[in-house]
Amino acid sequence: ESGTVNLPGIAGLYAGVKFVRAHRAEIEEYELALCDRLRARLREIPGVRILCDDGQAHMAITSIVVPGHDGGALADALDAADIAVRAGLHCAPAVHAWLGTLQSGAIRFSPGLYNTAQEMDDTALLLARLLQA
């Protein structure tokens, strides 16, 4: 074996795993609240289709389609504003075929522990502006 073992990296990984295990419930609750807030704001934007059932248990992921708009171009515009999303089929073409989004794909938002409620509002506001342009 060549080189030096990355002990600081191993220690950092251990500390991160330890933190997440200790606060898993709080992290999940916070991330789900962010997604609920984002979905509420997205529902206010005409033409946005949210790909989930209301009232069902969810992960902290929200996917949308906007008929008549290129998801990749919208994702690029959001990225230019430092809003990280993923556009496409998300390695799930069979699900997209079932949803009727196989041709368009979707835009996926996955807020995390270090995101804020204000960022959810800002994200929806920017998306609304992009769709009006």
What are these regions (language model features)?
Residues 97-133:
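PLP-dependent enzyme catalytic core of the Aspartate aminotransferase-like
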Residues 1-10, 14-39, 51-58:
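Structural signature of PLP-dependent enzymes
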Residues 2, 63, 112:
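Glycine- and other small-residue-rich loops at beta-strand/loop junctions that grip anionic moieties
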Residues 42-46:
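Acidic-histidine catalytic/liganding microenvironments
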Residues 13-16, 95, 123:
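Buried hydrophobic packing segments
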Residues 12, 65, 84, 108-110:
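Conserved beta-strand segments that form the floor/walls of ligand-binding pockets within enzyme
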